[in-house]
Design a protein with these regions (language model features):
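ABC family nucleotide-binding domain
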Residues: 6-7, 11-161
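Short, well-ordered junction/capping motifs at the entry into regular secondary structure
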Residues: 1-3
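Conserved beta-strand-loop-alpha-helix hinge in the C-terminal portion
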Residues: 166-184
Length: 184
């Protein structure tokens, strides 16, 4: 799947996903596209403080067509023992994993992740990167990771470097490395 934008791409101005020009979508079409096809992992977790881990993940699945199993998704991010806890009872890394589970549970076509390992130690970070990689392969999800961590870029099929808000380089990586080979 290609995602293209205008900044740094010369005269090209199109935003194309799955062969569809989403820059031509109406406001209603864009809302539906974001609701059903995109999962977001924000740098700030945006968890609902008076909902449990399970309820926070469940919240996202209420607006999608074919959600993944909530409990299995929470298990996959290593939080099955915290399923009944509230965000205030979780560490920053655990809250980040709830946010990742919430995005994955939507079963999106594309997952946009802003610093998904930012609050995680290296081992948990690698676990999450492996999960994202496996989900990408298993479910055909396009995963876009925005990060300052250069080591992670070696995992990507396509690496786009941004400098001063403009595309500086685009590199196709024919041999992405496994998460086990990454160290930071």
């Amino acid at each position: 799947r290609d995602v293209l934008g205008s900044r740094g791409l010369g005269d090209v101005y199109k935003r194309q996903v799955d062969g569809k020009r989403i820059d031509k979508y109406s406001s209603r079409q864009l809302t539906a596209y974001r609701r059903y096809d995109i999962g977001f992992v924000f740098q700030f977790y945006n968890l609902v403080q008076n909902l449990t881990v399970k309820e926070n993940v469940e919240l996202a699945t209420q607006i999608c067509k074919e959600p993944l199993d909530i409990v299995k998704t929470i298990e996959a991010v290593g939080l099955s023992d915290r399923i009944g806890n509230f965000p205030s009872q979780l560490s920053g890394g655990e809250q980040q994993r709830v946010a990742i589970a919430r995005a994955l549970a939507k079963n999106p076509k594309m997952l946009l992740c802003d610093e998904p390992t930012g609050a995680l130690d290296i081992n948990t970070g690698k676990t999450i990167l492996k999960l994202l990689s496996d989900m990408c392969k298993k479910n055909g999800i396009t995963v876009v990771v925005i990060t300052h961590n250069q080591a992670i870029s070696a995992m990507g099929d396509k690496v786009i470097k941004i400098k001063n808000g403009i595309v500086d380089s685009v590199v196709i990586n024919d041999n992405p490395v496994s998460v086990d080979a990454i160290d930071w």
